[in-house]
């Protein structure tokens, strides 16, 4: 390796491209490894950097949406990829959609022309001793995964995610739902779960819809998901299987699985429900709850309808939809600092989906922070930890402090931000505007000295 390169970046996806650019802009010489086109992932189609392999939408660009706030922060911090996306944007209402080929071309051109970035088109299977950013993405190669396992242990590297939908607490109808833990007999403890009870008839409607709901087609290398896989923490997600697959095993399969009612009594009726959907607290603030055992591959429109069939969630606000797919990611709560620095090796950083963030823009954001901090480390400057009041800071804090029992990839949403203390109660849109204003003010104060 050329010793004039001070920083190695592994992966030329969204996070790696942004990280390389940010470090180079700080005066650091960067060696960027990308194995395509000589090594393929099974999902990518081209050799371009920052290829979008799923949707061509980067989510809402409205200033009072979580994704819009994240983009506003990236603009303030000089994101290359966001600038490229806006250059080739397409009409998409309030969303930022792009011409995917032109987007990747612009990013590739910018990286190739940067005087301090060298691209090396080959697979890297050993983690270098030099200052390094690992941004190898959800389809990290087998060879690099082996090196990661040797470094962090097999229990801290996952190959599938099993994401259950998350709803906001404020949208749960507690006159229908109730708090309880199974077999609870005390009087003081109100229970750790919110339970949505179903009658026999309600379950029949729910089951029939689930049985006929349309699922996302799996890629060839994701076929194992149909039979259950280890996804996320092995202690909690061994043998994860989509809820729609369980339903196809028989009408009562769910009643002996995630919807089992045993040990629960509905205080509104004094009887045991026929079926129960349990919601588990997902963040320390208690503003988000996930649907226990509801990992799914159903299309988003189908998920929305089926969640609205659950008593107590008729008006449920879904802040994250469920999914199960091939996704290499590390157990960040035990391994990373919010600066994206590896705890056990000061000159190693991670960025992108491998850290446990979800979505294009979140990947760009963590890549940006990793690139800045790797450069700051090399320049003997203090690392930048963004405040939790910013969306980037909140995401980085969440993935590095999440509760182990519920650790799964997370996207930008208002539920991970600290609550705003105000004199009067705000409606949903007013609260979103307040979050956006606070984010802008806090971020400006944090980066003005950079």
Question: Residue locations for each model-derived region?
Answer:
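Conserved active-site and cofactor/substrate-binding residues in soluble primary-metabolism enzymes
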Residues: 14, 18, 44, 65, ...
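A glycine-rich dinucleotide-binding beta-alpha-beta segment and adjacent secondary-structure elements
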Residues: 291-357, 364-366, 384-402, 409-411, ...
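Predominantly flavin-linked oxidoreductase catalytic cores and closely associated redox partners
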Residues: 110-305
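N-terminal FAD cofactor-binding segment of flavoenzymes
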Residues: 21-83, 388-399
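An active-site-proximal "capping" alpha-helix that borders the catalytic cofactor pocket
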Residues: 362-377
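Beta1/beta-strand and adjacent pyrophosphate-binding region of the FAD-binding site
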Residues: 3-15
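A conserved beta-strand/loop capping segment in the N-terminal third of enzymes
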Residues: 61-108, 112
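Glycine- and aromatic-enriched mobile tails/lids
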Residues: 37, 354, 373-450
